[in-house]
């Protein structure tokens, strides 16, 4: 009887070890895939009435001061410092590596915390005719980084989602499947990596030669509909991207090549 009990215990321990090993393998597999974190999301009722652009700017607000924004749909990402964003009666604190959506045609007050300037990245979705207008009023100082004219075939009739997301691909992870956007996106590189591009491919066929190019911190990448590509990290550090995306409401942001 004691012998049988020992066999059962040994069997139970073996099965448990196999089960835990399987869970570990699954966890490692999951960890190797891209990790997407949505930081901010807004809704745009129409984007086909006039040519549209995505504009990216770096904004600095001195500590203890406030800037008022009233303009196009906007997304802000806090690089350093901290801010308090007030829209009507809604007040929200936003710290480093966090983001917020700023609605259009509304006074938005952005107050930088005492002691240090707040450094922001600001995406604006605006009419191309308004792209030269300043991103934010004094005392904020603004440096325009990039303007992307959104191709007409990237936008459809009806409401669209305007979102900001960080994408992290773990160090040494394999390259995700080639894909394109269903709308358009503008990326800012937060940690180095590589992009592979298929210039001759389309959403039905991965054809033609590919080329790989390094992207460093601060680099900017346009991703319109039909741009077939994939990102990959370095072997020893993760790839981190900040993405502003515009896509039709109810439609997946990403289209994988068949």
Indicate residue ranges for each PLM-predicted region:
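Short acidic-glycine-tyrosine-enriched beta hairpin
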Residues: 88-105, 201-226
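Bacterial N-terminal signal peptides
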Residues: 12-22
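N-terminal, post-signal-peptide region of Sec/Tat-exported proteins
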Residues: 48-92
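Bacterial N-terminal signal peptides that target proteins for export
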Residues: 2-13
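Sec/Tat signal peptide C-region and signal peptidase I cleavage site
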Residues: 23-27
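Histidine-centered metal-chelating micro-motifs
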Residues: 65-68, 100, 104-111, 174-176, ...
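Glycine- and acidic-residue-biased ligand/ion/polar-headgroup-sensing regions
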Residues: 71-89, 182-205
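Double-stranded beta-helix
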Residues: 29-37, 52-55, 109-161, 232-258
